[in-house]
């Protein structure tokens, strides 16, 4: 039963400009594009007239384009936006000669100037700082044009105004738009001697030495490391999620239940990490696009073998719940061809999320890998998991519904902690014996709290099977009473259609491999997409193929056949009677006898991190060990705050 006054929930908040659309134009007709929200990172490079401007659509990307188009100058590479304040020079776009710049501290006798770059410091909530352009200066305000700070449509040639205070001869810019997060920018950077380029002028002729140089090909390498010292008891047994992990697997990131003397992990470069982000972000959009095509097309939807009786409910979930928490891509990479391909999207899964977001980093610290010039690949997971919960539309209590397996329970507890961190109330529910029906026939928990939000590890397919079994047992005229026992289907497919589910029912579509041929035919030229068909074609026979059930988990009932017709691997399981799809065979690189599958996490609508499942078999399964990924970095950037600038001034 659906409520007539139900309001749809969505990540697309009213007034927020979608990613990539123009928010407005700064003076000089320089566009600013929406980055969607603060924690979204596309991983896509922005190239303007052969200049690398940054990543779409971060604040530095706008600053570089603004400086090039407004002044004919090129901003050198910086790690973070705040580091622009420490620059001594930029370059002339035409000559590549160095051009001195002047950084002016905020809170001095100098009044801000228009056509300069305003720089924000590092903070607890934003380590990288921020940069924008000052477009206008009044006696008590400055106007700012920027990206990735506020996401509305501009009403003029700037995004917002900031307060400018003049007191005791000192000029101070104050960002108090959010009274709960007042910020004082570091200052602004000026470009003496460089006038603004004429409105509508052709792009400056760029010196060849400033042209963008493509990066080296990415790599992913399995490594063996012998720690010089190790930290015992590196997981917190007072943390419920970590305690359950230890009970199940011990102190071992690989979950192999073995003590480690030498350790194995995977190292990738920054380019590999960026490719995971870019492909994951793009593919998520493609799967959402294909879901929209399927859900209201009866002919296509029949291919997915979802019972037609449940279509109205699934369509209701698509219409009214456009929020979600987690999904994981399965990527494969070949170090010789430097190709990365997507095998599938586990859009209704949270398995190995704790391992990716917390365990692999704590393990790396316990064996000293955090001191080896690398960074964890799951650093954004916990932040983005909290953001997903904060924006998902749930209020009050969330029931975390799991089986009696410890792996499901620690995964649930990890997600529960993130929900509670943003003000929700979480309750772990192992099985469903504690639930009952109230007098109105709605499900309540042991505290009498009506179920309004459910996070679950149960497959929707399990609930559907139970739904039809219950129909057969209860009969057509059955109505729930407090004396009746609550079943799985009563929680997931009961009378209340307005319960928020994580993941929602419509994720039956993107998590079904029947979507893969649609994805391929929609975007056949995308470098990460493999050919996929509903029937075995001559093209697939020629290159080899994987035969997969449209509904299945953990690598069950998969057959891999090469281009000669020889079967290289096959797995058993309980999905063999399902319809099949045929996917182009992709050659994985075998390292130290192992094949690696990269799990790429979407949390909410943002790509958030990676982890690896490896196996000596080319088909990874439920028991395949987890392996950590470390991202090689040249140096760890340091924050820049007002105190840092004060100390630098003292040292000088």
Swiss-Prot record:
Recorded superkingdom: Eukaryota
Alphabetical list of InterPro entries matching this protein: CHAP_dom, Gsp_Synthetase/Amidase, GSPS_pre-ATP-grasp-like_dom, Papain-like_cys_pep_sf, PreATP-grasp_dom_sf
Reactions mediated catalytically: spermidine + glutathione + ATP = glutathionylspermidine + ADP + phosphate + H(+); glutathionylspermidine + glutathione + ATP = trypanothione + ADP + phosphate + H(+)
Post-translational modification: The N-terminus is blocked.
GO molecular-function terms, A-Z: ATP binding; glutathionylspermidine synthase activity; metal ion binding; trypanothione synthase activity
Annotated Mg(2+) 2 binding sites: 344, 346
Residue ranges occupied by any Peptidase C51 domain in the UniProt entry: 34-174
Any one Pfam family match given in the protein's UniProt record, by short name: GSP_synth
Site feature Transition state stabilizer, where: 328
EC number: 6.3.1.9
UniProt cross-references to SUPFAM superfamilies, sorted A to Z: Cysteine proteinases, Glutathione synthetase ATP-binding domain-like, PreATP-grasp domain
Cofactor dependence: Mg(2+)
Residues given in the record as Mg(2+) 1 binding sites: 330, 344
Keywords attached to this entry: ATP-binding, Ligase, Magnesium, Metal-binding, Nucleotide-binding
Enzyme class: ligase
Family: In the C-terminal section; belongs to the glutathionylspermidine synthase preATP-grasp family.
Protein role: Conjugates glutathione (gamma-Glu-Cys-Gly) and glutathionylspermidine to form trypanothione (N(1),N(8)-bis(glutathionyl)spermidine), which is involved in maintaining intracellular thiol redox and in defense against oxidants.
Protein name in UniProt: Trypanothione synthetase
Organism: Crithidia fasciculata
Lineage of source species: Eukaryota, Discoba, Euglenozoa, Kinetoplastea, Metakinetoplastina
